Amino acid sequence: MAPEHVYGDVEGRALWFAAPRKAEFRPEIIPPPGPGQVRVRTIVSAISYGTEMLVYRGEVPPDTVLDLPTLAGRYGFPIKYGYATVGRVFDVGAGVADFSPGDLVFVHHPHQSAFTVPAEMPVHLPEGIDPLSGLFVANLETAVNIVHDASIRLGETAVVFGQGVVGLLVARLLKLAGAGRVLTVEPVEARRKLSLEMGVDEAMEPGENLAERIFTATNGRGADVTVEVSGSPRALKSAVDATADEGTVVVASWYGIKPVTLDLGGRFHRGRLRLRSSQVGRIPPELAPRWDRARRMETVLDLLPRLGLERLVSHRFPFEEAPAAFRLVDERPGDMVQVILDYGEGG
């Protein structure tokens, strides 16, 4: 028997980027769910300092194809963007057996007060979890993929460049994966302190003689694995310089249209280093026979309640102040870790 729709059309609001550094609200009509769909009211959503700020600033090539299931087309303006939303299901369509009204879910969806999506898109969050922790599903999934790409071995040393949200998560997971030592490099003192609180062995400030300091801290070997997740092309050079012979540099940043100049004639060539791109849209090929996105998500949901991720939320804005939140992230990135938008319980 098909479920009865509790509501008809619902009026909502979505945040759009109309032009570089211009965020504005636009009305949305949220239709009742059709067969195989669910309708969700947003509780909180998270602003990504990496990819999302590239989009906000207009630093993504406009002909790049959007790769999120809730988005279609390309990255040109105007664009509705965002991919970390937690809300509650309030209506389900015919044939939906896995969701009921009241279920707490994570959805890769732009910043919007309510939305209707196919039932295969929402992710059930663990019972009793704080919605704030649920916001980290996307970043944690990215971090798991990066650690898989790093292929860290028991007792090896890893250095993570950048201690934003993804960098903090990568460093924590590298320890859980068996790294003997994990060092981090981060210019912001508050983030270095948070990095230490999350269990890394040493948090370094970038600058003069960084590679030399890393070699000294690793008994002259250098790092077995370096991970560049700061978004800074300069940090990629530092990662290459700090990597041990036959070591791996994992490039997990998306630089957008920022030019990247890398000297491949010195340390990279003589040390026989490997450069590896990491992007969450694909499972590492050597794992594909055994891993898929469903298994990766199971791992994320198992880790989610155990990492105390609420501590990473540094700023909380009402949804109606979203344009101000984006200006803050754009102009003062060093003052924050994770900025969230609060819609009130159930929108």
Region roles according to the model:
Residues 198-276:
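Glycine-rich cofactor phosphate-binding loops and adjacent beta1-alpha1 units
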Residues 81-108:
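A glycine-/small-residue-rich N-terminal strand-loop-strand element
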Residues 28-85:
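N-terminal glycine-rich beta->alpha transition that marks the start or flank
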Residues 108-119:
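A structural motif shared across PLP-dependent enzymes of the aminotransferase-like
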Residues 130-208, 212:
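Mid-domain Rossmann-like dinucleotide-binding core that forms the NAD(H)/NADP(H) cofactor-binding site
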Residues 220, 262-313, 324:
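C-terminal substrate-binding/catalytic core of Rossmann-like NAD(P)-dependent dehydrogenases/reductases
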